[in-house]
Amino acid sequence: MATWNDLNDELNRWQDTGKDATFWWRDDDAIEPTDLLERLIQISSENTAPCMVAVVPHLAVPALTLRLNDAPTIYPAQHGYRHINHAPEGQKATEFGDHRNRTVLENELRDGWQSLQSFNRLAPIFVPPWNRMTDELNGYLRSIG
């Protein structure tokens, strides 16, 4: 198995040849400021490395908005609505699966998106909990932003 040193060595080789590495960096399940979130913000800031923070709209406290708004390298995104597993027993976890009423899903998506509008740099990206959602919502997501 590769180690962090292996990754660092590889990135150094890339740099030596003029290549840039592009990567996706995201933190999930944000609802309030925590020591770990603070550390993530610090690393992001020190390295000028933008980071997406997936915020659970229905659970997020006002202090999270204040803290993330003060962190210029942080980009909040909508992470579900309540982050509750609604999947039937025996199925993979999902909050936005096709087993739920479409109108309820659309209302939760819209309400969640609207509740996050006070975040600066809000990314127009939906991060479904457990990285699963019904494909039927793709068009609706585009329609709300």
Per-region residue spans from a language model:
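His/Asp/Glu-enriched short active-site or ligand-binding loop at hydrolase and phosphoryl-transfer sites
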Residues: 141-145
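Active-site beta->alpha N-cap acidic-glycine motif
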Residues: 2-75, 115-118, 127
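Metal-dependent polysaccharide deacetylase catalytic core of the NodB/CE4 family, i.e.
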Residues: 50-136
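Short amphipathic alpha-helical segments
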Residues: 38, 138-139
